[in-house]
């Protein structure tokens, strides 16, 4: 028993007792079945940088297997301004290593980030993920260095203005 895995804050890592990089479709299905997960979310970035979400209510095992295997079709022309309507059939396929239990969902929900693929099953060359991957490889080839970056997450709390906690706008990036 590996204590690092058992004590991991990612509930899937603790339950499956393996690191995220080793998650398989069967692992995800087992976690969903044994933990009462009722919804699966596929999350993917659009051209505007916003994270889009597809929600799937899990009503049977065949459906779960189908969405985990084949992903879901999305309209690329509504996601990216450079994709023409005539060639806009894209698929979002889940990356199992990104699976996490959504702490904000009202019903038990498992979320995963997705990759874009074209109608022929090939990675979408112009997707943000693939473009970054190609840039990292080129950077490494030219410099011999490895490119590492982390995203900046921003959360917004939207509620009626009650004037209870007034703040002055400081116009600084630290705020």
Mark where each language-model region is:
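ATP/Mg2+-dependent ligation/transfer catalytic cores
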Residues: 1-174
């Amino acid at each position: 028993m590996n204590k690092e895995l058992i004590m991991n804050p990612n509930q899937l890592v603790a339950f499956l007792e393996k690191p995220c990089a080793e998650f398989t479709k069967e692992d995800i299905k087992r976690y969903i079945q044994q933990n009462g997960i009722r919804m699966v979310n596929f999350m993917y970035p659009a051209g505007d940088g916003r994270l889009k979400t597809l929600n799937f209510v899990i009503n049977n095992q065949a459906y779960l297997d189908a969405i985990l295997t084949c992903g879901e079709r999305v309209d690329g022309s509504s996601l990216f301004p450079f994709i023409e309507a005539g060639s806009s059939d894209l698929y979002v396929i889940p990356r199992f290593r990104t699976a996490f239990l959504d702490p904000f969902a009202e019903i038990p929900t498992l979320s995963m980030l997705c990759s874009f693929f074209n109608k022929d099953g090939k990675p979408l060359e112009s997707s943000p993920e693939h473009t970054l991957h190609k840039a990292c490889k080129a950077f490494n080839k030219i410099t011999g260095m490895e490119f590492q970056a982390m995203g900046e997450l921003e959360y917004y709390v939207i509620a009626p203005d009650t004037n209870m906690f007034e703040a002055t706008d400081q116009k600084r990036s630290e705020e």
